[in-house]
């Protein structure tokens, strides 16, 4: 079997192969773009071929920026389009492609790789761990009354129904530039968020609101008329308003947009897709049970390729030190590192000291952004704590300034 990078001439073969791997047929091109594969970077795609040259597997990567805790932006490879023909499953094709791809990412100097897992059991064995989570919240419109905030000093805010800004409803085709600018402001401050390169917006490659699918967009503007949030939505049967994504530069803007869509006439319920599981919207409702959570699941998976570089890249919010014993069975690597945090900066160096925690590289990916507490994985039997208090200290160290969240599909 040969694994080789692709060129522009391989696009049709690559697309046909990945669709065949998933048992689907390629979509018909539509006016205005919108085909997901139009954003592929062909110099970052791989084809697996049999000895006689038949393509049987695919893998690709996008060039993204990932926001880390502390509002640090760093390059990250967004792995996608991974598939193997059903006729060649269980023959080592996927493992060979993953090993080839990880080596290629390292040769590019990249130390983080991320993906969305089609099936959860697949990617842990390649060193990826679930790092952000998402949920769907459904609110019956007749139960959508907001509670009166109990905290002092919150008068005249969207939480109380007061908003100095304004909301304008536009069609998706009218506001692409606004969406791109607002999303970019949002993702730079949100740990776990990925960039959406300009070419994605220009090609309309992705899911709504990037794609040209018909959508209405509620655009929020501040008191000076500057756009600072949006909600992309559509109304379908049975009388349901579905919000693809709500992007807001702060909680007040989100609340204003939530009030707007929950007040829409001629619908019986509003469905918010891709909310963080701990989002405060349920707490803002007068009836806590009115907001029904479903599809609570993983979203972004993270894989570290260089432990010291990755740990020193993110921001930290508690001083302390830990010795981490890290096993990377897929790449056949093992390392022990002393992580020292002082004044929000980390130093990470090899050490022969006794470990505080022993963990798999996939578990380090899960805790890296602060969305999974190390103590949770200790209790689950995945991380081993070698001394009392080690898990508690790890929780404090890896905590993020803001819960990580990603809603970008790729």
Region annotations inferred by a language model:
Residues 21-68, 192-217:
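Active-site rim helix/loop that mediates acceptor-substrate recognition in acyltransferases
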Residues 98, 102-117, 265-276:
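Conserved GNAT acetyl-CoA-binding A-motif
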Residues 107-111, 116-137, 277-294:
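Conserved active-site alpha-helix within GNAT-family acetyltransferase domains
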Residues 2, 7, 11, 69, ...:
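Intrinsically disordered, low-complexity, positively biased terminal segments
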Residues 73-86, 239-249:
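Conserved acetyl-CoA binding element of GNAT-fold acetyltransferases
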